[in-house]
């Protein structure tokens, strides 16, 4: 029987406080997260940002127990998916490839080679495609595969995004319905979708389909929820987790929460739409920071829908996703890692540092170059600012 390897790709996260700095360094070393004008600046900038952010991030992880549960939850998802696939008659073994912390993609490839896998199915644990999540993981996998003559021979099928998959939608509706049923007036409960944001330039310059997929997904969930409940709830979509001075996708979660409070919303059902497992953004950012903002805004009942984790309907849906990938049209790693052509938007390979598009982007890039020059002068101890006596 053919040996099938199911590779689950995820972000990764620090398991201990001492992991936080190295994890952040790995994150900001990725050019899909932060782009510098010249590649040589990438790692020095990553070191600087990770050093500056480390203490604050450590405090956030301490507030949820001292580390991220993302590896433990992903391993549980992998085990249950493997069991479900074997129940359905597939000789499948699951593997985990984290992008920025252990176990890394290299480790998963080594394990698949050692196990003699005949075919690989790649599932990003991000329902919606983005340059900075699935795209980065696919491109890392492609780079490693291209450099490994043995692994390159193994057939590989990829799922690019799966936000419209029936099992995913059904599991989301089940978990949302649980929280709605606890509200004082279920039909009046406000459904508040919050998705991880990305810089606006990813969408407008690079053609990232993430925003459109998030919007489509929220409407699909609302439609399925209405069929399930028999009534329609008011709903809102926002974006969280922005960092830095550039504009990210709007509306911002904290601003919408304040608006909903002013609108006298009493029952708020918060749906972390872009997260399939609990981690820092759900446990700390939503459960602590945003809950406090909501309460200060006057929202009486703040109910957060659990992440999918190992919800049985979700695991069943993942198994169906793997099977449909095996039986459906081939999507190889080259196709999975590329952005679609979009009118008036740049394909990913052309999304380079340059002077184009909006004045906001232009000014931001000038500021970044000035910052990098200043950083180099601080490190080297010499330069025009030293000669002028400013430094």
Curated annotation (Swiss-Prot):
Keyword Transcription recorded: no
GO cellular component: cytoplasm
Key word Cell wall biogenesis/degradation present: no
Pfam families the UniProt entry points to: Ferrochelatase
Highest taxon above the source species: Bacteria
EC number: 4.98.1.1
GO biological process, alphabetically ordered: heme biosynthetic process
Reactions accelerated catalytically: heme b + 2 H(+) = protoporphyrin IX + Fe(2+)
Binding-site list for Fe cation: 196, 281
Keyword line: Cytoplasm, Heme biosynthesis, Iron, Lyase, Metal-binding, Porphyrin biosynthesis
Database matches in SUPFAM superfamilies: Chelatase, Chlorophyll a-b binding protein
Pathway(s) it belongs to: Porphyrin-containing compound metabolism; protoheme biosynthesis; protoheme from protoporphyrin-IX: step 1/1
Stored NCBIfam families: hemH
UniProt record similarity statement: Belongs to the ferrochelatase family.
Function recorded in the entry: Catalyzes the ferrous insertion into protoporphyrin IX.
Protein's UniProt name: Ferrochelatase
Organism expressing this protein natively: Prochlorococcus marinus (strain MIT 9301)
Gene encoding the protein: hemH
């Amino acid at each position: 029987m053919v040996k099938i390897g199911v590779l689950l790709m995820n972000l990764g996260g620090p398991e201990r406080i001492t992991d936080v700095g190295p994890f952040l360094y790995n994150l900001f070393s990725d050019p899909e997260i932060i782009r510098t004008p010249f590649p040589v600046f990438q790692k020095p900038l990553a070191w600087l940002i990770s050093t500056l952010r480390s203490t604050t991030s450590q405090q956030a992880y301490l507030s949820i127990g001292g580390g991220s549960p993302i590896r433990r939850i992903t391993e549980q998802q992998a085990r249950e998916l493997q069991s479900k696939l074997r129940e359905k008659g597939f000789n499948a073994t699951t593997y985990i490839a984290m992008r920025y912390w252990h176990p890394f993609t290299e480790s998963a490839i080594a394990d698949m080679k050692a196990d003699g896998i005949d075919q690989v199915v790649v599932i990003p644990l991000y329902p919606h495609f983005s340059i900075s999540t699935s795209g980065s993981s696919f491109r890392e996998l492609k780079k490693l595969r291209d450099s490994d003559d043995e692994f390159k021979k193994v057939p590989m099928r990829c799922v690019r995004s799966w936000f419209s998959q029936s099992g995913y939608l059904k599991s989301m509706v089940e978990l949302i319905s649980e929280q709605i049923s606890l509200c004082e007036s279920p039909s009046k409960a406000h459904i508040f979708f919050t998705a991880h944001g990305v810089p606006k330039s990813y969408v407008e310059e690079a053609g990232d389909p993430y925003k459109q997929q998030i919007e489509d997904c929220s409407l699909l969930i609302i439609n399925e929820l209405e069929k399930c409940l028999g009534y329609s709830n008011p709903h809102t979509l926002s974006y969280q987790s922005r960092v830095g001075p550039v504009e990210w996708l709007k509306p911002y979660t904290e601003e919408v929460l304040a608006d909903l409070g002013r609108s006298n919303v009493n029952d708020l059902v918060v749906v972390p739409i872009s997260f399939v497992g609990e981690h820092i953004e759900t446990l700390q950012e939503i459960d602590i920071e945003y809950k406090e903002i909501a309460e200060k805004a006057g929202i009486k009942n703040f109910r957060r829908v659990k992440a999918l984790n190992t919800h049985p309907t979700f695991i069943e849906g993942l198994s169906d996703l793997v099977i449909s990938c095996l039986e459906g049209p081939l999507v190889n790693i080259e196709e999975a890692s590329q952005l679609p052509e979009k009118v008036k938007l740049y394909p990913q390979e052309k999304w380079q540092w340059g002077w184009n598009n909006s004045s906001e982007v232009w000014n931001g890039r000038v500021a970044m170059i000035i910052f990098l020059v200043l950083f180099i002068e601080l490190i080297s101890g010499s330069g025009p600012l030293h000669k002028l006596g400013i430094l």
